[in-house]
Amino acid sequence: MGQLKLKDLYIGKTDGYNEFLEYGSDVCRNLFFEYPNLDISKLLDGSVYYICGDKGTGKTMLLKYVESLIADNSDTNFSQFIRFKKDVDEDQRNQLKRAALPQAPFEEIIESEIPTDTTIDCVLAWQVYLIKVTVNRLKATECGVFERNDTWSKLCSLLDAIYNDKNDTNPLKKILPKIKKGNVEITAASVAKLNLDLEWTDDSKKAVPFVNVGKKVVDLYSSLTPCENRIYVFVDELELSLKKTKKYERDITLIRDLIFAVQYMNEISKLNGYNVFLITAIRNEVYQHVKSKGLEINKPIHDFGIQIDWRQKGGNIQEHPLLKMLARRFQYSEEYHGLTPTPNIYSNYFLPE
């Protein structure tokens, strides 16, 4: 029988994110077992950017593993991790829906309610947020990914003007600037030097429609000059609220449009030669619920996604990927306790059939 005692066997956490927090990237990388049908290089080069699978199939662990690979070259590769469930709170989710509402007499009522109309388009709001996250991460670097030229300066200044929060300690938390009746409050002085054609809603030039300023952000971002180095933005925990609630209907729209926003941002990167890669993990149940509403998200998922499914049809049961994963944890535990890794854990730790 094997030398390892049961109490010394490392099984791990039920959640991949918690495992990385508890044990660190080095341990988790040693334990990581690559999904057999996935070429990691396709995630790194942007060929695949949707990771789909049932709950507990290892989507978060895969994201964190890729993030750890990027960290090996932290001088040339940058990353940012967003957790939808944690970083996008209730107020921000409601505000995202309101940002997409057209100007109409009922807007003042909508402001205090949870918008549930699934025909509302929130893609632009998500794009602005993802651009802000990318820019804020790169602001911490002196160079890399984009040339620090006039267009870059304009984009940074415009984002600063519309968010107008110098004390924002966590840029992930604030999804959108303050929006009232579809308009963003901006002072003319803050954008006077940017030479942008903004559609002011009043003579005093204190407010601009979010749609107008949002498109300016996307246009400026699409006009940046790429350079060396890469940045990866990971979006995880795309989960729905409980069924039969307004929050559930709202989240369906938000997740649908976030999926499209990730696609559009990656398209901008490919068209302009940007080394900016967005990767997101999506639960199958979320995908099915969104699709059941008649929302056409199947094409981008099929074209740019990978399905994690550990089921094995036929063959040697000992070659099952999940059992190989378990064997790896036995061997890691042995190494950790100074023992020689067992070549065959089945013959050493389990009774014969």
What would you call each of these model-derived segments?
Residues 40-84, 202-220, 307-336:
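Long, acidic, intrinsically disordered low-complexity segments
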Residues 30-35, 40-48, 110-113, 212-216, ...:
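Short linear interaction motifs
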Residues 60-232, 241:
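P-loop NTPase nucleotide-binding core
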Residues 214-232, 237-353:
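The catalytic "switch" region of P-loop NTPases
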Residues 24-25, 58-59, 122-130, 202-214, ...:
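Phosphate/oxyanion-binding active-site loops and adjacent basic polyanion-contact surfaces
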